[in-house]
């Protein structure tokens, strides 16, 4: 089965040894993704929108898009940001309504990140 890996050019991908996304057959797995500068200065909503844009770009490289997402896992530093995070998630995924989990964590990388998202997508050719 064909395996395709995608890099987003984020230096930590090489440092840590991972791909932004991997497609195997009809399945696409996108690694945990945070906002990047200059969006790290924004609030949780702005950071989530920026992270989802990076996810969307990775999906497009393997012939998918946000409509193909079937599961999201969102990691948040502060659950007080849930309304902002949910707004960004709803605006981005309302049409496909993926299964979703929200997890509070102590810290993310980079340290100024407030939220991170990882997704699984299924592409029906």
Annotate each predicted stretch with a short phrase:
Residues 1-125:
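Short, polar/acidic, helix-capping and beta-turn segments at strand->helix junctions
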């Amino acid at each position: 089965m064909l395996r395709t890996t995608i890099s987003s050019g984020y230096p930590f991908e090489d440092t840590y040894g991972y791909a932004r996304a991997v497609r195997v057959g009809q399945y696409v797995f996108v690694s945990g993704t945070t906002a990047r500068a200059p969006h790290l200065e924004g609030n949780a909503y702005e950071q989530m929108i920026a992270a989802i844009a990076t996810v969307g770009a990775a999906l497009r490289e393997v012939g998918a898009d946000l409509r193909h997402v079937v599961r999201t896992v969102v990691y948040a530093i502060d659950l007080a940001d849930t309304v902002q995070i949910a707004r960004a998630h709803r605006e981005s995924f309302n049409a496909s309504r993926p299964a979703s989990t929200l997890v509070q964590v102590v810290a993310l990388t980079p340290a100024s990140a407030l939220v991170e998202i990882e997704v699984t997508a299924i592409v029906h050719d």
